Amino acid sequence: MPKRTLQGVVVSDKQAKTVVVRVDRRFTHPIYKKTIRRSKNYHAHDENNEFKPGDMVWIEESKPISKLKRWTVVRGEQRKTA
């Protein structure tokens, strides 16, 4: 079975080799038919501490690394600086 991959934005990099990634999802409410946006934070392993808050990253499911980390950063795009 293939590993799940999610796309999100880094919201915190204050831990060593770990980033917190916010993943947004959209769905339609089954009764009211309104599009709703929900978000969830995932702790992901970042071996080289290369991603900073605001960067767009892709995370992939992995075996448990610690109590909260079950995802690994696969690739990312640094945000453009002005």
UniProtKB/Swiss-Prot annotation:
Cited Pfam families: Ribosomal_S17
Keywords, sorted A to Z: Ribonucleoprotein, Ribosomal protein, RNA-binding, rRNA-binding
Single biological process term from Gene Ontology: translation
Function statement: One of the primary rRNA binding proteins, it binds specifically to the 5'-end of 16S ribosomal RNA.
Subunit structure: Part of the 30S ribosomal subunit.
NCBIfam families per record: PRK05610.1, uS17_bact
Entry similarity comment: Belongs to the universal ribosomal protein uS17 family.
Protein name as catalogued: Small ribosomal subunit protein uS17
Gene name, Swiss-Prot/TrEMBL: rpsQ
